[in-house]
């Protein structure tokens, strides 16, 4: 999550589509925008850990990673009353040591399967194209919360996904209720399938919206 100027818009857009999303926030964001995190949580959206200081965790000292992760979780729990169990690595970068450390802390490391690349400020039409084509059940769509083009594109994205038959839920809802699990690379996969082969998720029409 970046700034907070679109918080109310996002809550309204998601509510109108009856959609729930997972927001990965940093501790620094929590320091600045605790009220916005509370609004998102109260609206039924999931708040997850995106680190405290947004460091590069690949090659990071284990004790430093643990401390940084715990601090972000502490801040989120202070605001929402719930300790997060999902973690997204800053920059999408990690290594086996970091993943093992985070798993040992009870955190599921989450990656995305469809990136809107909205940080590059594409047109709303481009965002729609990237996030509504070739979507399969269990997909995690990545957006950033404080970009105007994303806010403009989102109603059409949500409408298209629902018309394709997808239920829009949080990552945790899919893990708890769906036929999916997270592998050691943070990738969503069916519990009953091997990861070495290309997979078409045909048995569960859930898609996940993730913001950071």
Task: Annotate each language-model stretch with its function.
Residues 1, 24-28, 51-52, 88-92, ...:
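Active-site-proximal beta-strand/loop segments in catalytic clefts of secreted hydrolases
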Residues 4-6, 32, 54-55, 93-97, ...:
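Active-site environment of divalent metal-dependent phosphoester hydrolases
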Residues 14, 47-50, 72, 87-90, ...:
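Conserved, mostly hydrophobic/aromatic
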Residues 16-17, 21, 30-32, 149-211:
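C-terminal domain-boundary segment and adjacent tail
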Residues 62-67, 125, 148-151:
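Non-membrane alpha-helical structural segments and their capping/turn regions in soluble enzymes
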Residues 85, 93, 98-134, 166-178:
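His/Asp/Glu-enriched short active-site or ligand-binding loop at hydrolase and phosphoryl-transfer sites
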């Amino acid at each position: 999550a970046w700034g907070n100027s679109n918080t109310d818009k996002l809550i309204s857009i998601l509510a109108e589509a009856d959609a729930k999303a997972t927001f990965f926030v940093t501790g620094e964001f929590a320091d600045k925008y605790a009220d916005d995190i509370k609004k998102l949580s109260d609206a039924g959206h999931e708040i997850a850990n995106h680190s405290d200081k947004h460091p590069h965790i690949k090659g990071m000292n284990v004790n430093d990673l643990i401390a940084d992760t715990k601090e972000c979780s502490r801040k989120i729990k202070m605001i929402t009353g719930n300790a997060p169990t999902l973690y997204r690595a800053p920059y999408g970068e990690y290594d086996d040591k970091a993943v093992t450390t985070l798993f040992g802390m009870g955190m599921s490391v989450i990656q995305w399967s469809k990136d809107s690349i909205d940080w590059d400020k594409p047109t709303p039409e481009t965002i729609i194209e990237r996030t509504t084509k070739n979507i399969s059940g269990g997909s995690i769509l990545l957006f950033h919360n404080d970009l105007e083009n994303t806010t403009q594109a989102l109603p059409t994205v949500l409408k298209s996904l629902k018309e394709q038959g997808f239920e829009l839920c949080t990552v945790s809802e899919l893990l708890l209720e769906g036929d999916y699990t997270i592998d050691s690379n943070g990738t969503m996969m069916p519990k009953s399938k091997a990861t070495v082969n290309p997979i078409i998720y045909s048995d569960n029409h859930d898609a996940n919206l993730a913001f950071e």
